[in-house]
Amino acid sequence: MKTFSLKLLVFTLVLSFINCVAFAAADKPNIVIIWGDDIGQTNVSAYSMGVMGYRTPNIDRVAKEGMIFTDYYAEQSCTAGRSAFITGQNVFRTGLSKVGLPGADLGMRKEDPTIAELLKPLGYATGQFGKNHLGDKDEMLPTNHGFDEFYGNLYHLNAEEEPEHPDYPQNPEFRKKFGPRGVIHSWALPDGKQKIEDTGPLTRKRMQTVDDDV
């Protein structure tokens, strides 16, 4: 298992981009990034050696065969962490520090770079699956920012079940303007546009099986 400091990581990334032409001609490794929501470092036994009383063998295998990082700096927010990783920018530049409400203008902008856009010239096919948290308008979806495919929800953990609450406003105009979108399946098209399907709300019942969708 290899442990890398932040400085070594930055140096490695710089060397990688300098030699991108050489890499483009060679076989490329698969890149799998797993974001865990609301977990601590000790919840993954690759870091904690199982002190929580259980093991995470599949994730531990990824760590053993690849790299394990010990330092990462971001705000304690899903949106801030995802935006920092995907764009390589801090929240003072992107403004993506907190989760936006349905229909909010807060989200990915046209000028924001993404890791997917950097990988495309190297021949990678890219996808994002699960929670996104970087804006719910069409222009903010991952498939408008370098990803070939996206399947997931756009809000915090239980936002899409809120309309099930008995005190949720029933006014159709309110729901149309402020209600959450469902689970989105989208694709980037060759002409620069997107194909977008709303597969329906992420209800409490659907949460039991949604992992089987992908």
List each language-model region with its residue ranges:
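Formylglycine-dependent sulfatase
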Residues: 2-7, 17-214
